[in-house]
């Protein structure tokens, strides 16, 4: 029986390029000269840390970062979980943006429920941070891909491991 997996993985190369571009733009901006404005990517933990002198500066850094992510096709802008702004020494602030990787249990259940309610003759099962969809024909699976793409637009999904 044909099957495929629905997953959500971060393209770390594109994300790193976007953060590097944003870092260069921050270093070159005249209103950030002489300030502690910076941006860091921790690939291992999946965190982007923004440093600045005020909340306004953090907003400006985000205004630089998000379009850079869109240009580099790092669909991670939808994946960012904005943590609270933290005050650090003196009047400096930092904010951590956590990158959500994989499909969490809530979204996986939503996908399975959508497929059951859709009336398409497929079976969906949750396997860790992926959802495996199995159907009788390849055409039905292609309908499922189109249906899921249309139904879930708030989180980037990839469809892979297509087996016949």
Swiss-Prot record:
Keywords: Nucleotide-binding. Belongs to the YajQ family. Gene3D superfamilies: 3.30.70.860, YajQ-like, domain 2. The keyword Nucleotide-binding applies. GO terms for molecular function: nucleotide binding. Nucleotide-binding protein. The keyword DNA-binding does not apply. CDD domains: YajQ_like. It comes from Methylobacillus flagellatus (strain ATCC 51484 / DSM 6875 / VKM B-1610 / KT). It comes from the Bacteria. One of its GO terms (cellular component) is cytosol. This is Nucleotide-binding protein Mfla_1706. Pfam families: DUF520 (PF04461).
């Amino acid at each position: 029986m044909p099957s495929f997996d629905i997953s959500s993985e971060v393209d770390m190369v594109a994300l790193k390029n976007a953060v590097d571009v944003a870092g260069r733009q921050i270093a070159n901006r005249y209103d950030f000269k002489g300030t502690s404005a910076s941006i860091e990517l921790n690939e291992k933990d999946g965190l982007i840390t923004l440093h600045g002198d005020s909340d306004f500066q953090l907003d400006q850094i985000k205004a630089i970062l998000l379009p850079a992510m869109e240009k580099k096709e790092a669909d991670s802008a939808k994946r960012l979980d904005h943590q609270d702004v933290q005050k650090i020494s003196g009047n400096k602030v930092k904010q951590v943006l956590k990158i959500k990787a994989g499909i969490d249990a809530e979204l996986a259940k939503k996908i399975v429920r959508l497929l059951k309610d859709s009336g398409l003759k497929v079976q969906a099962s949750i396997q860790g941070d992926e959802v495996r969809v199995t159907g009788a024909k390849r055409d039905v699976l292609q309908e499922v891909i189109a249906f899921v793409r249309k139904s879930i637009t708030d989180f980037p999904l990839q469809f892979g491991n297509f087996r016949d």
